A protein has these predicted regions:
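Boundary at the C-terminal end of the N-terminal hydrophobic targeting segment
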Residues: 16-18
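A conserved glycine-rich beta-strand in the N-terminal activation segment of trypsin-fold
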Residues: 34-59, 175, 197-198
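Flexible, gly/ser-rich surface segments that form the specificity/activation loops bordering the active-site cleft
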Residues: 95, 114-174, 188-198
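C-terminal cap/linker of serine protease catalytic domains
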Residues: 71-72, 82-89, 114-115, 185-236
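Terminal peptide-recognition signature
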Residues: 48, 54, 58, 106, ...
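Envelope-exposed proteins and targeting segments
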Residues: 44-46, 52, 70, 99-104, ...
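Sec-dependent N-terminal signal peptides
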Residues: 4-13
């Protein structure tokens, strides 16, 4: 998937992932499941949306250290399953114009089938009530959580690629699903530093540049097609 999306960015707050230093290092086992080796790593929490039984879209923040990753895993039934970074970008493309991209595509082994949702290829309008579904890193049970929110006007990003929400998102919600009427219409990626009660998300229209050709849904249950994603980066 060699697609590019160019977005205009302002200064954002710390991305919606959390880090923790743990004495484990994940490596890929023959089964695709994760084994552990003794090593200090930094664990980065985020959320991803499965749009195909083998593919997940998340943010470049979650996979931003892809060149240095010890491993990146998807939590399936409370078990870590090793994934491969198919595409990842969290970088400024043009400093003068502040053009920026923050998207990642992950792939799991073909022997593993994810619950995938359809991501609607449409713009999102100001005033729409929506639901956020993701994984808070403080939730030790690895269960998805949902919050109601509303799309609000904001001049930070140009529509229709980017929209704003009337709430600040918790850690672990980078890559959370935005839905309305039970359909995924976007994905969160960051909080604003200009407004403490504003966060941002990509519309389904923006995500379609990465997901449309491979979007093959298997479920309509958004809680089932969102997964916690964990990146492991060597601490030293």
């Amino acid at each position: 998937m060699k697609h590019t999306i160019i977005l205009i960015i302002c200064i954002l707050a710390t991305a919606l992932f959390a880090t923790e230093t743990v004495p484990t290092y994940l490596t890929e086992a023959d089964s695709g499941k994760a084994d552990t080796v003794n090593m200090d790593v930094t664990k980065v929490y985020g959320t991803g949306i499965a749009f195909n039984k083998h593919y997940i879209v998340t943010t470049g923040d979650v996979a931003r250290h892809s060149k240095k990753l010890a491993a990146i895993v998807v939590m399936i039934n409370n078990e870590p399953v090793v994934a491969r970074v198919e595409y990842s970008a969290d970088t400024v493309l043009n400093k003068d114009k502040n053009e920026y991209v923050n998207v990642a595509i992950l792939q799991v082994d073909n022997s593993i089938s994810l619950n995938a949702c359809k991501i609607e290829d449409r713009v999102v309008n100001v005033g729409e009530p929506v639901t956020l579904t993701g994984f808070n890193e403080l939730n030790t049970k690895v269960q998805s959580q949902s919050f109601p929110a509303k799309v609000v006007a904001d001049s930070t990003f140009p529509e229709p690629a980017i929209n704003a929400l009337n709430m600040r998102l918790p850690g672990g919600f980078s890559g959370a699903a935005i839905s309305r009427h039970g359909k995924v219409i976007g994905m969160t990626f960051g909080n604003s530093t200009r407004n403490a009660n504003t966060s941002f998300f990509y519309s389904g229209f923006a995500l379609s540049k990465f997901t449309l050709q491979q979007n093959k849904p298997t479920t309509t249950d958004i809680a089932k097609c969102t997964y916690q994603v964990r990146s492991y980066v060597p601490a030293k």
